[in-house]
């Protein structure tokens, strides 16, 4: 990979709860006590309505992942929430969806010549990526400025995880869905201009301390 000897080792990738993290030749399902950022590839994230199953797993268990659409994931989540509220409904079972490789890409475009992609990261997170997978201070600035602008917005954001060239946005699924959030973030991204004129807080550290 770009950041290490193993193909799974990339520069940065934020982690959502329920994400499958490929750490070298080992796969790890990240729970709520797992890290929020690291340098390994995360190909899929469990639907929110299925997260309870993670707590039932034991070492050595075999897990089969089945692709679902956002709409199907919402049905599963709603059925689970109804059950929690003693409104028992049958949890829907779906045939595996035949999704294209681009299904998770909610939006893509350019900002002043720099390409960006907004990807699905489970149901309640989106991942905004700027430029190619490489160390680049200009791409870092894009992610930093976007995070600063989102912090000033009134969007229902729970938290954000910045990477080197990316930003994961965790939002309140009860107020906005992933496609709506992606559209809001894209609109703000399009207003990022004149990075050469942007100043960010910094400090000088002299070594040895």
Give, region by region, the residue ranges found by the protein language model:
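Glycine-rich active-site loops that engage anionic ligands at enzyme catalytic sites
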Residues: 1-209
């Amino acid at each position: 990979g770009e950041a290490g000897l193993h193909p799974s080792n990339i520069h940065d990738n934020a982690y959502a709860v329920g994400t499958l993290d490929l750490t070298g030749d080992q796969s790890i399902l990240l729970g709520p006590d797992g890290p929020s950022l690291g340098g390994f590839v995360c190909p899929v994230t469990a639907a929110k309505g299925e997260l309870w199953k993670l707590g039932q797993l034991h070492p050595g268990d075999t897990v089969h992942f089945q692709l679902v659409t956002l709409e199907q994931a919402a049905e599963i989540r709603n059925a689970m929430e109804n059950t929690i509220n003693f409104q028992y409904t049958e949890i829907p079972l779906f045939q595996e969806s035949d999704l294209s490789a681009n299904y998770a890409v909610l939006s893509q475009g350019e900002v002043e010549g720099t390409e960006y992609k907004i990807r699905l990261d489970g149901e309640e997170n989106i991942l905004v990526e700027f430029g190619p997978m490489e160390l680049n201070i200009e791409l870092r600035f894009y992610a930093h400025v976007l995070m600063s602008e989102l912090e000033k917005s009134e969007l229902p954001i729970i938290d954000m995880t910045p990477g080197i060239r990316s930003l994961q946005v965790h939002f309140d699924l009860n107020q906005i869905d992933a496609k709506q959030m992606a559209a809001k973030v894209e609109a703000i991204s399009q207003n990022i201009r004149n990075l050469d004129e942007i100043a960010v807080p910094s400090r000088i550290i002299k070594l040895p301390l």
